[in-house]
């Protein structure tokens, strides 16, 4: 899979008009048709504060749920579980049934709070971009938004970031000021060294001491079988595991038309490539890699979602919220 770990070229987003863009993103969140503009990664890249970014994304996402394809689903479901035959009807939420035509049982507050551990791949390959938003930035946006959303649900949030080792670890807590600590650690992350993804996920599994939800955000450039075994380790302890596979669109589509020099972002090995010769084989290799990850995740009851860095964040937030509601 090393042939997939490539940095073709590094592009940098323009900083001009940054302050105006931040204000526009907040004041005019619905400035485009379709997905809310505040969920667009390129707009988010112009907001310098992760705390402001996360609050803007999550509050906009939650308020927009009733207008979305996910009609009838909202964060209140995190305090419910689906009705099962034999459940005491005294605890059926009749008001929710009337609004949504769905049968849910209320859960006590003590039963609804869980630990959410967010694991971020900060290896060198996460620097790659052709859209102006690197995979690392997208992971930071996503992790910050998930941390804010989990805190909004009264969950304890923890963070781990890794490349060849776990270099950042904030244990899960739910106390005043903790979310700001999480934001600060996420903001300081820099994509750096070579990764040993599977090995590091095994180490992360040993650090999670209480059952909860584990979110893994990575480009998953490692042997798929080794990755699945590591995810099984996370899952084995009774955790619900959500995999967010983040790639640049060009990594999946390989849209180069001219000869190009490819450089492995972690080993710095370079190779000259003729796109006409490589393109089909490359796309097939990527497709096979993704399919093996998706199938392995499904076999182990792990949620798998593939995102390119141009994709709005609402898809990821809904996936997280849906998994959280099953707790």
Predicted features by range, described:
Residues 1-19, 34-69, 79, 206-212, ...:
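Von Willebrand factor type A / integrin I
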Residues 2-17, 34-174, 213-217, 223-225, ...:
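An amphipathic, basic-hydrophobic helix/alpha-beta surface used to engage anionic
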Residues 16, 24-33:
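Arg/Gly-rich low-complexity intrinsically disordered repeat tracts
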Residues 137, 191-198, 221, 284-287:
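Conserved phosphate-coordination/catalytic loops
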Residues 141-145, 195-202, 225, 291, ...:
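Short, contiguous clusters of charged residues that form electrostatic/catalytic patches at enzyme active sites
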Residues 170-184, 322, 326:
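Short, electropositive alpha-helical surface patch
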Residues 178-212, 224-225, 248:
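Von Willebrand factor
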Residues 217-218, 307:
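Thr-Gly-centered strand-to-loop micro-motif
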């Amino acid at each position: 899979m090393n042939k997939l770990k490539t940095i073709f070229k590094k592009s940098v987003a323009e900083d001009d008009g940054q302050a105006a863009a931040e204000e526009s993103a907040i004041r005019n969140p619905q400035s485009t048709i379709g997905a809310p503009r505040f969920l667009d990664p390129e707009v988010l890249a112009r907001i310098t504060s992760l705390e402001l970014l996360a609050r803007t994304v999550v509050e906009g996402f939650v308020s927009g749920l009733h207008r979305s394809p996910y009609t009838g689903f909202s964060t209140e479901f995190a305090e419910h579980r689906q009705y099962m035959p034999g459940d005491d009807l005294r605890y059926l939420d009749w008001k929710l049934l009337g609004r949504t035509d769905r049968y849910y049982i209320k859960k006590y507050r003590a039963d609804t709070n869980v630990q959410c551990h967010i694991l971020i791949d900060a290896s060198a390959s996460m620097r790659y971009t052709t859209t102006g938003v690197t995979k690392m930035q997208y992971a930071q946006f996503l992790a910050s938004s998930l941390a804010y959303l989990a805190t909004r649900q009264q969950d304890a949030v923890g963070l781990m970031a890794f490349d060849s080792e776990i270099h950042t670890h904030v244990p899960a807590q739910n106390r005043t000021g903790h979310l700001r600590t999480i934001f600060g650690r996420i903001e300081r992350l820099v994509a750096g060294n070579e990764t040993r993804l599977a090995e590091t996920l095994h180490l992360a599994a040993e650090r999670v001491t209480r059952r909860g939800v584990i979110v893994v955000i990575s480009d998953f450039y490692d042997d798929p079988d080794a990755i699945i075994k590591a995810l099984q380790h996370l899952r084995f302890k009774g955790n619900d595991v959500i995999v967010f596979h983040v790639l640049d669109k060009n990594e999946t589509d390989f849209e180069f038309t001219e000869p190009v020099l490819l450089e492995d972002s972690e080993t710095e090995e370079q190779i000259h490539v003729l796109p006409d010769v490589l393109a089909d084989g490359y796309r097939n290799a990527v497709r096979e890699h993704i399919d093996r990850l998706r199938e392995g995740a499904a076999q182990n009851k792990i949620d798998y979602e593939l995102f390119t860095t141009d994709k709005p964040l609402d898809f990821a937030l809904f996936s997280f919220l849906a998994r959280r509601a099953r707790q």
